[in-house]
Amino acid sequence: MAVEEGGCVTKRLQNELLQLLSSTTESISAFPVDDNDLTYWVGYITGPKDTPYSGLKFKVSLKFPQNYPFHPPMIKFLSPMWHPNVDKSGNICLDILKEKWSAVYNVETILLSLQSLLGEPNNRSPLNAVAAELWDADMEEYRKKVLACYEEIDDY
Amino acid sequence: MSSGTENDQFYSFDESDSSSIELYESHNTSEFTIHGLVFPKLISVTSQDSEFDINEDEDGVDTIYEGMLDAPLTKNNKRILCEGSVPNLSYECLTTKGIFERMLQRVDHLQPIFAIPSADILILLQHYDWNEERLLEVWTEKMDELLVELGLSTTANIKKDNDYNSHFREVEFKNDFTCIICCDKKDTETFALECGHEYCINCYRHYIKDKLHEGNIITCMDCSLALKNEDIDKVMGHPSSSKLMDSSIKSFVQKHNRNYKWCPFADCKSIVHLRDTSSLPEYTRLHYSPFVKCNSFHRFCFNCGFEVHSPADCKITTAWVKKARKESEILNWVLSHTKECPKCSVNIEKNGGCNHMVCSSCKYEFCWICEGPWAPHGKNFFQCTMYKNNEDNKSKNPQDANKTLKKYTFYYRLFNEHEVSAKLDWNLGQTLGTKVHALQERIGISWIDGQFLSESLKVLNEGRTVLKWSFAVAYYSDASHNLTKIFVDNQMLLANAVESLSELLQIKTPEVIMKRRPEFYNKAGYVENRTTALMECGRELLCKGICKAAE
């Protein structure tokens, strides 16, 4: 009795949406942009306390392939982001979104991982080399860069 | 017409060079004397092929390690044109199945040392790319850590209850099971390892199916515990782990491409394993090429992966092929020998360089390049704009571009003509079996006696291949040098010899074939001699730097 891939992804995403709506975590949230299309979501992440991103909110996009959850969603920062592991277009370098992906991960764990990445960048493989240098050298200047880059989310 | 005349000089016999040619030929003749016997044996000449035959002896050590075997070295007996010589290559031919069987033998051999199940050793070896030395080293240092690291053991404290243990690594049926992967609640078969991470059978199959083609160790979806081959087969319901092994071996061949090469011929699945690569630099230095032969008798160059390309070395071959690809659009167009008259469709063969064509049948005048009517082209040396545009696009100096194109066109046409002839000869080979059979039936000769036909065809094919690639060498050679002129003369001699032998092989009547048998021996022997001479002359051009690929 073979399960259709489309059916699998739909049921899975419906389940994830229900879990998120009932979640008590306030620092992250996500939902489909279009009620009729479960494969494209936007998510919101609050910067962790005691980091250069404290108090700031960031918007990301999540595009789910038909073979999700056996393959990871494509995630990008829609908000401008100054971070060693994020490039100018918002592309993210994070191992669990690539070779370390597992089908047991979900939207919540992904967003929480991104939130952790804000406070703990991986400076060994930076997409933004200047940010990687400043992180170690000058946190004050780093914070200034983050704020200079920051834009309030207008549809939150 | 003038360009034709200019090119003809390459093939013309120049009186002033006669002494050099005689000296060179005399040198070769003394090595390859043909006896005047009525039924002489075909002279066995040392050729590239004999150097690269697969070793018949089985090595005592049964391993696919790099550099673990002492390759038997035999000096090349051929006359040396410059310092040094190259040893015979020591290689073997394998298939993925053969490699896998060898891997299993190694696992069985190692099992008493490791004292763990064979399926576990298979995973350990897979992780260390079948480097047994490295594996044993790490195993000695940190045995338990290694098992945990590779997912063959768990630090979790699991109950040792016998009944509980029996539920792991088995497909079980569950009622009302909710799978956290597909979020479906249903009655379904499930699978789990000792870690207890349980998923429905469909999700596990989907997951494994994706992983089989990567060639990596497959783990639990939620932790690093490894699935063994038998686990994979249980989940999938049929022997799928062989696909994983295939992918693992392909990945292995890819990673070790200094020692392993896939046969480049279409649909051939052979892998050539070069045991000792230490002599390869010497091949390159002396402008030889490491030709090998797979189990299906496909011969190719281990270095660059192309077919056998003597007398060109890998550098010339690569440059020539690259140029051929770049120029192919123009050349396929320019080199068309015949076209239909646009008006009455009679086939017209182009002669000379003029693009102004007149159909001999209906007298229609048209342009050879664009096949349009000639009248709008006018006169006064007008060239077709299509051709002109191509030239303009190629270079800022149209005159130089045109000259380059003409030179290349000349050599490519010759290269291509012998490629086409080689295909025709291949078709000829298909009919040889019929002829040999007819010889046996009608005249009653033995199979052995009919072998001269097959041998002649083999010599013909090799001669054609060498002749074909010799035009690539000629293209990159300094045309003004004396040795290049000698090379061109050798080309002409081989071309004539090849055509002569090819003509002989067209004979259909078995009785006539047997009557003219001495001619087969003589002509095949001559082709073989001229082939060797051309190869050596070409190599000399390379060694002396007269032939070199411009960067």
UniProtKB/Swiss-Prot annotation, chain A:
Pfam families: UQ_con (PF00179). One of its GO terms (molecular function) is ubiquitin-protein transferase activity. GO terms for biological process: anaphase-promoting complex-dependent catabolic process; protein monoubiquitination; protein polyubiquitination; regulation of mitotic metaphase/anaphase transition. GO terms for cellular component: cytoplasm; nucleus. Residues 8-155 form the UBC core domain. InterPro entries: Ub_conjugating_enzyme, UBQ-conjugat_E2_core, UBQ-conjugating_AS, UBQ-conjugating_enzyme/RWD. Keywords: ATP-binding, Nucleotide-binding, Transferase, Ubl conjugation pathway. It is an enzyme of class 2 (transferase). SUPFAM superfamilies: UBC-like. Pathway: Protein modification; protein ubiquitination. Its EC number is 2.3.2.23. It catalyses: S-ubiquitinyl-[E1 ubiquitin-activating enzyme]-L-cysteine + [E2 ubiquitin-conjugating enzyme]-L-cysteine = [E1 ubiquitin-activating enzyme]-L-cysteine + S-ubiquitinyl-[E2 ubiquitin-conjugating enzyme]-L-cysteine. The active site is at C93. Catalyzes the covalent attachment of ubiquitin to other proteins. Belongs to the ubiquitin-conjugating enzyme family. This is Ubiquitin-conjugating enzyme E2-18 kDa. It comes from Saccharomyces cerevisiae (strain ATCC 204508 / S288c).
Swiss-Prot record, chain B:
One of its GO terms (biological process) is histone catabolic process. Zn(2+) 3 binds at C341, C344, C359, C362. Residues 175-388 are annotated as: TRIAD supradomain. It is an enzyme of class 2 (transferase). It comes from the Eukaryota. Pathway: Protein modification; protein ubiquitination. A zinc finger (RING-type) spans 179-225, 341-370. CDD domains: BRcat_RBR_ANKIB1, Rcat_RBR_HHARI-like, RING-HC_RBR_HEL2-like. Zn(2+) 4 binds at C367, C370, H377, C384. Pfam families: Ariadne (PF19422), IBR (PF01485), IBR_1 (PF22191), UBA_ARI1 (PF21235), zf-C3HC4 (PF00097). The active site is at C354. Members of the RBR family are atypical E3 ligases. They interact with the E2 conjugating enzyme UBE2L3 and function like HECT-type E3 enzymes: they bind E2s via the first RING domain, but require an obligate trans-thiolation step during the ubiquitin transfer, requiring a conserved cysteine residue in the second RING domain. Belongs to the RBR family. Probable ubiquitin-protein ligase involved in the degradation-related ubiquitination of histones. Contributes to the post-translational regulation of histone protein levels by polyubiquitination of excess histones for subsequent degradation. This is E3 ubiquitin-protein ligase HEL1.
